């Protein structure tokens, strides 16, 4: 299934390392949500310039995916906190200011990782791409959550937890990411956009 296993797993390990660094950063500075938001916003503007504005072929699909993920994520966060399913700590508001930026970066992170991993698949069929997307959306965001949960950023109150992350949260994370991926797939199909990840 994989042409170069060493490179494939090296990219995944590099991705996990990025999550660890981000999780520790948010965990240690959780009470300074404004400053975290500012730093994450700067990172987003850097990514937009580097990946969308500067290149000759503009990848507007990436920006659409980032905005859709942000919208879906914040709707879910608002619903979850309002219903008492989880709670953020050490902030003066229900939702920390950095949250929308974290959702935007989550899409960018998964998309860029898939861009590196898909060329390493022997069979680049839609089925294999979907399987890879499901696997990454199931494992990696939850891995980042485990770190921040253990550093006291938030607490889930749902049952059936694995390292502080409940089964329902795994399902919600996959749902948001796969819904965005499905929308982007149909955008690519309708407007005949050639994208390694979505078609």
What are these regions (language model features)?
Residues 1-199:
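Aromatic-rich, lipid-facing transmembrane alpha helices and their immediate juxtamembrane interface loops
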